Amino acid sequence: MNREHHILIIAKNTNGIVARIMSLFNRRGYFVKKMSAGVTNKEGYARLTLTVDGDKESLDQIQKQVYKIIDVVKVKIFPEKDVIRRELMLLKVKADEETRSQIVQIANIYRGNILDVSPKSLVIELTGDIEKLRGFIGMMSNYGILEIAKTGIVAMSRGEKM
């Protein structure tokens, strides 16, 4: 059965490594829904978290194929449990004198940060799991969403293991 899965890839941070990884997914016909990438605490290494749909067989195949890429040192399919997943969202919403305080109050309930205030809009930063972000988007849609920008999901295993 196809479900959404999160894949961790650790690779040497060499020129073109992200392009080579994404090219493999493209050539094999795997659709990457979301991607986030950055450096790790270990100098010279990059960390990618990809969100893909797939079943167990296709995930096993993806894992084997990615390991074949030179400079890839770790590939992990995150399990459903014992994993922390977060995404960052910036949301610009219409806000006038009448609605501004209501929007700020809702943002505070969701633990959002107000990054910009203008006469006709607010920009709010929110971090959380997908359900929290969806809930906030639903609340803000009543006021008129002007723009949304989201990162890909970042994920990390709970406990001491990677």
Q: What positions do the PLM features span?
A:
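Long, contiguous binding/interaction regions
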Residues: 1-47, 51-162
